[in-house]
Every structure is written in structure tokens, then in C-alpha cells.
Amino acid sequence: MATRISLRNARFQQLQTLLTNRNKRHRAGQFIVQGVRPITMAVEHGWEIQALLYDGERRLSQWARDVLAAHPHTEHVKMSPDLLAELAEKDEVELLAVVAMRPDVLDRIEAGPDFLGVVFDRPTQPGNIGAVIRSADAFGAHGVITTGHSADAYDPKAVRATTGSFFAMPVVRSPSPAAVISWVEERRAAGLPIVVVATDEHGDADMSAFDLTQPVLLLVGSENDGLTRAWRDAADVTLSIPMTGSASSLNAANAATVVLYEARRQRLAK
């Protein structure tokens, strides 16, 4: 039997905090997902759906009815249209999902001979995190790691920007570079020669001339400050992206996309 929310009561306020308060979101271990494709991807990839919030005053689409029917033991919450729209930050919405977070454990990322991973160091914009995740998924990466004091990958803007890719690959936060560098060294010691690759306008080599078919961990610097000294020191090579025109650099997410595409191109041609 579905519960109901028709007032801005304590439960509604708790749901709001999952959207607006990073600390409370992580304490609860939950985040809100909206949209047909993101919710479908979360279900298909086995994410734990903890509650389904839906418009209790309209006839739901077949898709929404199917999602509800597929989760009979998940909490179903009927909401008034105005409150549901407030959570979704849009007027027309029929279904939202409350999803359990997955642990920030680097071992969730599988690293084999064709490994391609991304580190996004201290990103400040949730939308850029989402864009990097989307590109990483599109071009065959095995995971994305955010490091340092950064925007939250579970921020609704970040999740929305991935258009569902967030649920298809591991996305892990590491407080500092040290844990990631240790993770790389462990895999090197086990025989996997991961190459740590940074990019810069004054790089050591053009990216198209470098072998990106080997196991690669791509470093993407903060939008404002680039990579920290720790990451610059950890990089085995710094590549440049060939550009014309007056632009001296690319947006962090765009730069990551270009290198990920080049890695995919080389691997397909191999």
C-alpha cells in the first residue's frame, strides 16, 4: 500500500535535503533520480531503489506503472503534483526514485589489460562531473574517480548531466591522490603497467602520437586550478591536445572528452 505526501511535512523536507544538502545526502546514503533513462539505467544496472515517488493524481504512463510493478517491496509514495514538481524542479514529472548510494571503494573499478580510467581532480561544477562521466561511459572507460575537495557526483545536476551513464560504471570519490596512487601501484606490482596521463598545453607529446591503447589512467584537472602538485608529480607523461585559433585551453570536461575519444579511436584501430 502506498503512503501519501500532500503537505510539506517532515518527510517531504527530508526528501528535499537529498537534493540540496550534500552532508545530509551522504549521511542518509540516498539520492534522488529523475527521468526515464536515468531511472531505467539504475534499475537495469542493479542499483537499490529504496522509494518510488509518483504523482497520485494522474494516470501514469506504462513505463512508470512497469517500474512500480517491478518493485512491489519498495516503498511507494503518492505525492501531490505540486510537491513532486518541487522535488523534480520541473512542472511535468510522474515518477522519481530514491536510490541508495554505492560505497566509495576503488576496488569497484576493474582494471585489466584494456584499462581506461579517469581521475577528475577537485572539480567545482557538478555539471562538469556529469559530462566527464557521460564521455567516459561513451568511450569505454572503466570508471571515474573524483579526488580532493570537489563537487558531489551525487548532486542532482551531476547525475542529470550523465543522462544515465552514472549508473553504468563505477564513480568513486577519493579524499586525496595518495589512495589512488597506491591503488595504481598495487596493480603495477601485480603486473598491470598502468600509465598515468595528464594533459597540458605545453605537454611532452601530442596525444595522437602517444600510445593510448595501453592501460591508461587519465588525469583531468580542476576547472580553475588544474592539477595539484601531487598529481603532476604522479603523471608518467603530459600530453598536449592540438588546437588552432586563439583559445589557450579547453573546458575540463571537453579536454577529457577529446582524449577519451582519441583513446577509443586508437583502440578500435589496433
PLM region spans:
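Short, acidic/turn-prone active-site loops that include or flank metal/cofactor-
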Residues: 57-59, 81-83, 149-151, 176, ...
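Active-site/ligand-binding-proximal alpha/beta "capping" segment
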Residues: 197-246
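Structured adenosyl-cofactor binding patch, chiefly the S-adenosyl-L-methionine
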Residues: 97, 137-139, 153, 160-166, ...
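Arg/Lys-rich RNA-binding interfaces used to dock onto structured RNA substrates
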Residues: 1-126, 149, 193
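Short, hinge-like loop/turn segments at secondary-structure boundaries
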Residues: 69-70, 95, 161-165, 190, ...
